[in-house]
Amino acid sequence: GLGDVYKRQIIFLPVERFSNTEYYMSVLLNRSTGRNMIMYSTEGGMDIEEVADKTPHLIFTEEIDPKVGLQGFQCRKIAFNLGLSGTAFKEMTKFVSALYAAYDGIDAALFEINPVLKTSDDKILAVDSKVALDGNALFRHKDYAALRDKREEDPTDCLLYTSDAADDDTR
């Protein structure tokens, strides 16, 4: 849709490097509170809507106070709720912190990682992701227009978008 920008990159990694541990994680705006939140689950690699319908108790959220941003204790809480310990716990706290910093830094509307994998050597990797940029913030990021892939957009989208319209934005 309007303002969504996608860039794809395919990376092949040997399957034996991974344990069977997959997680779901996303950063998005909680429209009911007007605050960003991290939504996460131990049920990665699955359709998150199906998980929400059948086992909602397996989906957690962590709301971010815009005055102070994501705090270290929140990253640790997420790693704890995912059942991690030791090196994997530390790696997940770094991953969550970096994920939120990236989301916040590019004016994203959504960062969704599904699955997030814990490897057999306790590394945390984003395997598949979806990033949606906030269309209202594109005027601050003129360089994002080059990343736009119209093949990824919904052809039935009724909203008109042209680069001229974005250039004429007077906000």
Language model regions located:
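Conserved active-site and cofactor/substrate-binding residues in soluble primary-metabolism enzymes
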Residues: 70-73, 87-98, 106, 111, ...
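Acidic, glycine-rich loop-and-beta core segments that form the ion-binding/anion-interacting portion
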Residues: 122-163
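A generic alpha-helix structural signal
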Residues: 79, 92-100, 162
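Cap/lid and interdomain-hinge subdomains that line or gate substrate/regulatory clefts
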Residues: 47-88
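Short capping/connector residues at structural and topological boundaries
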Residues: 28, 51-56, 64, 138, ...
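Single conserved hydrophobic/aromatic residue that forms the stacking wall/gate
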Residues: 1-9, 161-171
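Phosphate-binding site of ATP-dependent enzymes
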Residues: 4-54, 95, 99-102, 107-132
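Noncatalytic linker/hinge segments flanking ATPase motor cores
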Residues: 10, 55, 65-72, 151-160
